[in-house]
Amino acid sequence: MTRLIYFSSRSENTHRFIARLGLPAARIPLEDRERLRADEPYILVVPTYGGGGTAGAVPRQVIRFLNDEHNRALLRGVIAAGNRNFGEGFCRAGDIIAHKCQVPFLYRFELMGTGQDIDNVRKGVSEFWQRQH
């Protein structure tokens, strides 16, 4: 059961956060030639790119993944990572995806997240899926 799908750049910050969560997850590939297809409803975990603006905030691999109508139809919520140095642009990728895909923006965390973020996301993801049934 893969209930989380995530993207992580070569910095691996989001990957480390997912590893610490200890929940089943699938990774959107870094390389364009590789594809991931969702096979059940999922929550997307995504980093925010750029310097706080809207342009370029959502990684192109995530855009390509969500441009697949099948993948987009199974999206149920979004969690975003960001850098508070970007001010109002903090976790902007989550805002953009939630708005465009009409799903809830469930949580935001900075960089690799804290222990409290890990606890909050574990609890929040569990409660979210319980409410979906």
UniProtKB/Swiss-Prot annotation:
Pfam families: Flavodoxin_NdrI
Database matches in InterPro entries: Flavoprotein-like_sf (IPR029039), RNR_Ib_NrdI_bac (IPR020852), RNR_NrdI (IPR004465)
GO BP annotations, alphabetical order: protein modification process
GO function terms (MF aspect): FMN binding
Highest rank taxon of the organism: Bacteria
Gene3D superfamilies to which the protein is assigned, alphabetical: 3.40.50.360
Family that this chain belongs to: Belongs to the NrdI family.
Entry function: Probably involved in ribonucleotide reductase function.
NCBIfam families: nrdI
UniProt protein name: Protein NrdI
